C-alpha cells in the first residue's frame, strides 16, 4: 500500500468530521493536536475506522495525537506490509 501525505489525511479527517470546510485544515497543522483542531474522541474513533477501511491500517483512536504523528503511524504500518 502506498504511503499517504497530508492532503489525503485532511480529506479523511474532513470526511469523518462531517464539516468539510468549517475548520481551517489548510494551514500548518502537522504538529497541532486534534483536540486543538477541535476534534473530540468520537471524531478520532471515526478517523481511525476510516483509516482501517480505506488503508487497512489499524490504529486505535486514542493513539492519534497530531496529523504528523498519524502520518508516521500510517506510513510506518503500510511500509511494514510491503517489506
From Swiss-Prot:
Residues 3-83 form the Carrier domain. Pathway: Antibiotic biosynthesis; tetracenomycin C biosynthesis. The modification O-(pantetheine 4'-phosphoryl)serine is found at residue 41. Coiled coil: none annotated. GO terms for molecular function: transferase activity. 4'-phosphopantetheine is transferred from CoA to a specific serine of apo-ACP. One of its GO terms (biological process) is antibiotic biosynthetic process. Its cofactor is pantetheine 4'-phosphate. Keywords: Antibiotic biosynthesis, Phosphopantetheine, Phosphoprotein, Transferase. Its EC number is 2.3.1.235. PROSITE patterns: CARRIER (PS50075), PHOSPHOPANTETHEINE (PS00012). It catalyses: 10 malonyl-CoA + 8 H(+) = tetracenomycin F2 + 10 CO2 + 10 CoA + 2 H2O. Pfam families: PP-binding. It is an enzyme of class 2 (transferase). Involved in the biosynthesis of tetracenomycin C (TCM C). Part of a type II polyketide synthase (PKS) that catalyzes the synthesis of tetracenomycin F2 (TCM F2), a precursor of TCM C, from malonyl-CoA. TcmM is an acyl carrier protein that serves as an acceptor of malonate from malonyl-CoA and acts as the tether for the substrates and intermediates of polyketide assembly. The tetracenomycin polyketide synthase (TCM PKS) is composed of a ketosynthase complex (TcmKL), an acyl carrier protein (TcmM), a cyclase (TcmN) and a probable second cyclase (TcmJ). This is Tetracenomycin polyketide synthase acyl carrier protein. It comes from Streptomyces glaucescens.
Amino acid at each position: 500500500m502506498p504511503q499517504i501525505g497530508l492532503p489525503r489525511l485532511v480529506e479523511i479527517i474532513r470526511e469523518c468530521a462531517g464539516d468539510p470546510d468549517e475548520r481551517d485544515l489548510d494551514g500548518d497543522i502537522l504538529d497541532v493536536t486534534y483536540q486543538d483542531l477541535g476534534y473530540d474522541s468520537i471524531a478520532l474513533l471515526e478517523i481511525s475506522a476510516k483509516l482501517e477501511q480505506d488503508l487497512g491500517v489499524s490504529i486505535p483512536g486514542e493513539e492519534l495525537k497530531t496529523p504528523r504523528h498519524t502520518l508516521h503511524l500510517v506510513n510506518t504500518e503500510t511500509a511494514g506490509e510491503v517489506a
